[in-house]
Swiss-Prot record:
SUPFAM superfamilies per record: lambda repressor-like DNA-binding domains (SSF47413)
Superkingdom, taxonomy of origin: Bacteria
CDD domains for the chain: HTH_XRE
GO molecular function: DNA binding
InterPro entries hit by this protein: Cro/C1-type_HTH, HI1420, Lambda_DNA-bd_dom_sf
Protein name: Uncharacterized protein HI_1420
C-alpha cells in the first residue's frame, strides 16, 4: 500500500502574527522579488485572500496574479497589499556591503 503525501502549504502554518513576521523577514533576506511576492501571497491566503483583496481595493483574481511568480505588480500595489495585511517595511542598514 502506497502512502499519499500531502503537498506542503506554508499558509496553513502561518497561524500567528509572530510566525508571519518571522516568515516574511526571512524571505526578505533572500533578495528575490518573486519569492517575496509569493510569501506575501502565502500570508494573504493564511489571512483570507478575498478579504485582503477587498481591503487592498483590488480584485481577488488580480491579487492572485500580482502575488504569483508571473505577476509584476507596481510598488503601489505591493504597498496596498502590505497595508491590507497590516504589515509594513522597516529600513535598516544592509548587512551586505
Amino acid at each position: 500500500m502506497t502512502e499519499q503525501l500531502k503537498d506542503f502549504d506554508v499558509a496553513e502554518h502561518l497561524t500567528s502574527e509572530e510566525e508571519i513576521q518571522l516568515y516574511l523577514n526571512e524571505i526578505l533576506q533572500e533578495d528575490n522579488i518573486e519569492l517575496i511576492l509569493s510569501a506575501l501571497g502565502d500570508i494573504a491566503r493564511a489571512r483570507n485572500m478575498s478579504q485582503i483583496a477587498r481591503d487592498a481595493g483590488i480584485s481577488r483574481e488580480g491579487l492572485y496574479k500580482a502575488l504569483s511568480g508571473t505577476g509584476n505588480p507596481t510598488f503601489a500595489t505591493v504597498m496596498k497589499v502590505m497595508k491590507a495585511l497590516n504589515l509594513q517595511f522597516q529600513v535598516q542598514q544592509s548587512r551586505f556591503a
